[in-house]
Amino acid sequence: MAAMKTTPGLVNFFIFNSTYGPREGEEHEKIILYIPTEEDIDRKIKTIGLCEALVKFTETFAPDKPCESLHTQKSRQIFYQPEPDFWMIMTISIPFSEKIAKDGKNTIEYHYDDVLDNVLDAVLKQSYKMFKLFNGPFNYLSETYGREALKKRSEYFFLSYLQTLNFSSFDLLDIFAGIQFLPLDKNTFLKIQSFVNLIEHTFSQIKYTAFLYSDKLVWSGLEQEDMRILYKYLVTSLFPATIDSELADRSSQGYVVIQPKSHHGRFVTGPPDLKDIPTPRKPPRIFVNTDTEQEELLLICYKALDATICLLVSAPFPTLDFFKKLDMFIGPQLTTLANVICEQSSKKSLSSDQQYRYIYFNHMNLAQKSTIHSKKASVAGVSPEIMRLLGDISADFNSFQEDGETYVKTMSDCWVVGRKSDQREFFVILNQKSANLIEINEEVKKLSSCHFNNIFFMD
């Protein structure tokens, strides 16, 4: 009988600031958030105190880079300092399997290699960035609204956010957290750029704009890191929820009523319709440029067919009249642009590269391209073992901080190739059991020249 293997799961998650409770008897004041919330207060204080001691001890050896992770037999603890004096710590259980030995006794085997530090580190950092997107930095909240407000907002956000995480599914793509760009011809791109400029000129409340088509970014006026986290929110949370809502509406009605309209545009965030309601539904509030200033803006997303335009709007809160003018101005032109892009994309899809399994990431512009986990991929999925191997190779590239190339043949006769060149990483998975190293190298070159011919890779 095969042994059942557990999956990694969240043990605890906490945020603290040592300066909030520096004296004896005030240790509980350091705690901003501790999950599970029902944990005994003495246990919380003891756990955080141990982590504080580890941080202070490791600071003596590396002041700029103290404790990053703690490995034990049953768990992995990840440390992250997002802001001065603020620490976020996440503990994950190590998967294990229980086997029955010949003498009848149960033995437990822990699978340490199933949990990668660099992957968990990326997940923890992502959780902070997502919190900051909707609430602002910790210190800003504390100074502006007080510590109690910081604690309440942290609890409200992270209790919901952490429930959405599946720790057995995270991999190299979560480390990169890149952006998929949509390549277009010059004329189409200029039309989109002119359209965006015209919108920002016509509506002075709009500070930044992003244009996406079918979950791929076409244009953005935001800073790179702000767009990175906003893109993550859009493609993993907002857009899928919108599609689910549309399908639910259709199934509940049993049919779809097509209203006569000059365009196919509608608001994804904002008023669900443009009837004369007194107060339209408030769009999400987000924070950008938090490193230099606190820009608090409203996120208005407007969709026509597969094209979505994201508008970041400053105060005051837009009126219903504002939304109506936006709809009349954007709807027809966005519908036309969506049809143009659709026609161009359909031509390119004829020469698809889905027969290859690869990941490409550019650290300079965050461009990411992958056929792994792709909904359109016609090839078989990639096993968790191979994904962990990709994570290990990338970690090696990062530790050496030099360009290089790695070829690995797995026990299942699968070839894995990793290349790093000029801040770009490229990974290919090939199921060619009888191929030798020279043949695999030629196959990778063929893939590079066919689909990345304008990108230089070291030979």
Swiss-Prot record:
It comes from Nematostella vectensis. InterPro entries: Ccz1, CCZ1/INTU/HSP4_longin_1, CCZ1/INTU/HSP4_longin_3, CCZ1/INTU_longin_2. GO terms for biological process: vesicle-mediated transport. Disulfide bonds: none annotated. One of its GO terms (cellular component) is intracellular membrane-bounded organelle. Belongs to the CCZ1 family. This is Vacuolar fusion protein CCZ1 homolog.
